[in-house]
A protein has these predicted regions:
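Phosphate-binding/catalytic loops
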Residues: 90-166
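A short, active-site helix/loop in glycosyltransferases that binds the activated sugar's phosphate group
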Residues: 82-90
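Conserved active-site segments centered on acidic
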Residues: 1-75, 83-84, 96, 164
Length: 166
């Protein structure tokens, strides 16, 4: 059983979608989300709720949460969506850099061997890798429902690949 954390900016869209989706794919793991610039206690955005509903998923109890030291200590893996999230962890939680990787990179590079998840993460040398433009999942905030739906589809496709490796 792994402790998996998704980190986005406000913990209202991308990390919420990913958390709810991965919980449905991997119920045996502990999965939660947080934000780098979040107002704690807010529900997910309405557009996020609708995007999740298109996958027959929901989390009516979600409340936004600002990333803190306890989250970083808890997590076996922190999955991010853009370079700014990596930069935030590097500034505020540098001891966690070895377990921080973008969702696209992890979906592409995490192997599915029988080794422990922590060993497979360590082999990626995430703290030494640069964040490349192909790794970004654009924040749908401020976009219309179609933008949120496209973001949810992108996240879902990546999680369907990655879930097989946990």
């Amino acid at each position: 059983m792994a402790n998996l954390l998704f980190l986005c900016t406000g913990n209202a869209a991308r990390s919420v979608m990913a958390t709810v989706m991965l919980r449905s794919l991997c119920p045996e793991h502990h999965i939660r989300g947080a934000g780098t610039f979040s107002i704690s206690g807010l529900p997910m955005s309405q557009r996020t709720r609708v995007a999740l509903a298109s996958f027959n998923l929901s989390d009516p109890n979600h409340r936004s949460h600002q990333l803190d030291d306890a989250d970083c200590e808890w997590a076996d893996l922190i999955m991010i969506f853009e370079k700014e999230h990596r930069d935030y962890i590097e500034r505020h939680h540098p001891d966690s850099m070895a377990i921080v990787g973008s969702l696209p990179r992890l979906a592409r590079e995490l192997d599915d061997s029988d080794q422990s998840l922590s060993l497979r993460i360590a082999k990626l040398d995430l703290d030494k890798s640069a964040f490349d433009p192909w790794e970004e999942i654009t924040d749908p905030a401020g976009g219309d429902q179609e933008i949120f739906d496209l973001c949810a589809k992108e996240i879902s496709a990546l999680l369907n690949q990655l879930a097989l490796r946990f």
